[in-house]
Amino acid sequence: SWNRGVLPLIFRAGGDFFISKTFDHEKRILFYGAEDYPPNFVLIVFLIFNAMFLSANSPFVFLDGERLSASDYFLPASTVEEMPEAAEEAMPPCDCNISYDYVVGTDCNSVTNLTSSSIYPSIPAGSVVLIRGQLNVDADYNMAQNSQIYMDRGAGIVVKSGYRLTLKDNTVLGCNYLWKSIYVENGARLRLKGNVGTKIRDGEYAVHLEDGSEFQMQEKTTFLNNYISIYYLNGGGAACDILPFRGVLFKGTSSLKPHYDGVTSYPWAYAGLYVSGHPMLKVGDLSSNVNGDKNEFSGLRNGVLAFNSDVEVYASKFSDLHDLDYAIAGFGIRVQLGSLRVPGTRFKDHCEFVNCVRGIYMGDGDLEVKYTDMTGIDDYGIMVEKGAYNDIEIVSNDIESTYRGIISEDNDPVNQLVISQNKVNILLPTPSVDGKEMLIRLVGSNLPPVVSATVSWNVLTGADVPWGIYMNSIDGYELSFNEVSMSHSNVLGYRGIHLLHSDNNSLCQNTVSGDYLTNSQGSLSTPSGISLTESKFSLLECNSTTNVYNGLLVSMSCTDSKIRTHTFDDSRYGLHYLLTGVTGLQPDAMASHLHGNRWYGSWTGENGAKHENSNFNFYSLSEYYVPSSPAEANPPNVDPPGWFQNDNSRPELTCENSYCNNQGLGGGSGPGALEQAVALGYVNPGLYVEQITWTLASDVYRELMHHPDWLQGNSLFQLFYDSLSLTSLGALVSLQEQASALFVLSPEDQISVDYYRQQRDSLWSVLSDLDSQLAAAVSEMDSTSINAERMAVMQYMAQLRAEEGSVWSDILQARADAAQLLLTQNEALVPGNVMESNSKSVQEVFLQTIAQGVYALDSDQITVLDAVASQCPYTGSGAVFSARALLTLSDMDMNYGDAACAGNEEWVQPQTEFATQDKHELRVYPNPTQTKLQLDAGHILNEQLVLYLYDLQGVLLQTWELPSGSRFFDLTLPFELQGGAYLLQYRLPSGEKRSHQVFILK
């Protein structure tokens, strides 16, 4: 029975009082931003409303491990004293003194139905309308185009259920105070349209959507200086429907107008979108029916905030989002509970984050983030935390931050985690304060992943950052092929890769480089390439470190680790064992710290290995092999201790047989350096970046389709392949491969075709032998007998020809049917750039013609192909050459001026000329052929046309009579024709003879 309103919340925790802010839920309170509370504390809620304290008798008791962060809690009805329904507090007097053409409402407390107002049924375009109080839209209504709608103090528009409101090129704005909202009821619809776009500004909740409402906005729509631009809270019904949108601007430029109640204060635009309980919110879109530039969230405190919702974000830019004014601020995208996908693509529609405090936050849910660009990030780029059994995929993002890059914290156990192919660069403007600056931070609770967890192919650069890849209480992860570059001016003790309390992990083929000077003093705080602390059962293979004090630093208990095949260049120590805090232990106790390790490696530094204690028990059951001297151990090899040996002969000194080698690239028939560079996005093609990058990506994608074995166990190529499989590029390559496969006979068809070919060859041999016998016959009886035998062979050959013709007819029909299906798929493709548009167009013509056995082009197809063929191949891609090849089916003289395209000269549109086809000119295709010809007479025949087929000696072999009334004809060639050249002849009505040379393949 509470009234709706904003209820301040006071709660007590650990003896101190705190105040949290809530939104206008009914009997529901949203806690957010509350962390690190003492265990087993009791929360006593006091709701301040109408100057009265309502005390709930400890309705919430939180136990150890429970979190308040962004969670919904419902107040038990039995614990709250009910209040009688109160009338809504009167709005202060209206004060909007603008000149207007039409006014709706008499004062700021009035409620007016549209159908009884002065603006119904219509008003002239360009009108100025003032709304006082509440306007109920109780009929479908199109606001006059280019009109301005001024909203008086606390005014609002309510679109009633069953009706639609359309704003086209309108501006909705406040006068001196904020106005409430355009509230869209269940079953109501709101449309924002226009050529220059509709602008909505100065609203509290500019568009407030109810369950079951529908909202559509076109490109160029602008939301300016609203507290929240689009607002939705699930009330328990079907969610609102926000239709796909692009090119929409959400912007904050200045402090907000004063709140209409005179009490509440909103200092700045809080969020572009705020939703709670939405089953699938899509921000941005990739579909063909949505045009426009990226959505932009600029100058707000947050871009997109979502709670208990599944969210997808495409084609959006987040800029200048600062951590001011509110408890939650500075987020590009923040989702708490639910899931978040920011998939992007390699070539377009990725999300950008510029000058934001934080890029993306996901709390307790699945996360997929790909191909984002982040620059000027103050805190972190991507963070996912406080979840379990979730899928986390962070791939191919480019992050530039001043503090942290990628964070996964308290997500144990993950179902599957992939952090791969990201570029992270951190430049600290000031010296490290809390030591938490890191490129990738992984913190867990020692629960291994359900499926797998890999951190691979990342390129990480840090200046004055203590940690490159930091792992704390992480078990069962694989780190491979990462490149970490560290430097320092204020931070000495950086670690390229650091494992703390983390067991059963593998580190393979990672590279760490630093800027250590070899005369620096060594201690725990000095730079180390890789360090292990209290981390057991580790597998380290084929890693390389350079220019650090310690190549590999091992401290405390690191038992039963396999440390092998490393290269430590320009280091004070290749391997450094540091056992602080264990002096005075008995030998057996000390032996448990570092026993059972095996290490093979090489370095060019000062010492091969250093052990802080020469007592043999520290390294019992351990073996260390190095390839050559000088590789002196410290303590020295006295007695000798037996744990440190020079040995050039051991096969373990190379990576050839290592576990990591199986995860790498190359090797015989496998992919090479170019494929690797393309998959990583490291190719710099120069001038035509987009075109060449697209072409290389399509080529590598095609290779992977032909070599699925390259994907096995290789996360780099698997991620690259998956990232393109659902894009238009991947679909085009797949269609091209399927189109090529149309001309590959199935095993069954190949057997049939081979059978008939062998039979024909055999029969031709028999006929040749019979012809020789016939020429040598000395009597009429012999000739008669041979001719009879020859006739029987010819009849059998005719039977085989008919059977073979039937087989080929079925093959060609199946090919045409399959081509038609591919044509339908091709038509559904949505090209994202000129290369894809060209490829789609050429593919369409190919599937309409050659793939269906048609070897002629109509005028529309010629126009389509010529538009592609006339482009510069550098910008139009390989489809330009494919179009030119198809145009050879036409009588077209082609001169495309590629010399100008290749040089620096200004591109000149090529000149193309079409040869005028004589209306009596007959075209023959395919040529060469095997069994059939198709003819195009060039026009519908007005009279019968007779065709004659001759061999080159002038012997008439076949005659066809083509009836009038048709233009296209199918001809079956005589079955006994051998391979070679023949003449097809006909006579024009004028009496002139025309001939075509036809080639037959046997």
Task: Tell what function each PLM region has.
Residues 39, 979-1002:
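C-terminal tail/sorting-segment detector
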Residues 74, 79-171, 905-907:
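N-terminal domain-start segments of secreted/luminal proteins
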Residues 99, 240, 255-259, 594-902:
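Extracytoplasmic/secretory-pathway proteins
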Residues 120-123, 141-151, 165-179, 193-205, ...:
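Beta-strand-rich solenoid/repeat architectures in extracellular/passenger domains
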Residues 130, 136, 142, 150, ...:
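Extracellular beta-strand solenoid repeats
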Residues 911-939, 949-956, 999-1002:
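Surface-exposed, proline-anchored Ser/Thr-rich loop/turn motifs
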Residues 943, 967, 978-984:
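A glycine-anchored, Pro-Gly-centered beta-turn/N-cap motif
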